[in-house]
Amino acid sequence: MQRILVGFDGSEGSEQALNRAMMLIYEYGELFLLAVIPSPKDKSFVDANAYETMKKKACNLIDNVIKDLGEQSFKIKRLVEEGDPATVIIDTSSRLDVDLIVLGSKGQSELGQYLIGSVSNKVVQYAAKPVMVVR
């Protein structure tokens, strides 16, 4: 696989998805780590500070993972998008023309409420790209 998109929220499920994706990625390929946060228009945000805090947390989470992975034979890119997680994952996979989407089957983290569980089911149903759900 040359281009793999991993839905990542820091949960154990997303860590397992990342590990599986790393086994599948070709040398000199591209691995995209995508965190999806709610839109600031979402009712869960009382003020703009809460949105900015969550966005920074998502960026730091992925940056730390990339740092921990160290030098690889493939590129790793951070993506932080806002909106409905399943829709964002599906749209991003098409926009980036990835070969595979890899998601955890379940999990929970501070970002996890927006990424894991029913989201993977929706992505499997509606994505135009192949999807791997890791248990």
What are the language-model segments listed below?
Residues 2-46:
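Small/aliphatic-rich secondary-structure junction motif
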Residues 25-27, 70, 128:
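Short conserved AdoMet
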Residues 47-53:
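Short glycine-enriched, charge-decorated loop/helix-capping segments at active-site entrances
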Residues 70-101:
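Structural beta-alpha unit
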Residues 103-125:
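Glycine-rich, Arg-bearing micro-motifs that act as flexible, cationic patches
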Residues 131-135:
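Short hydrophobic/aromatic patches at helix-to-coil boundaries
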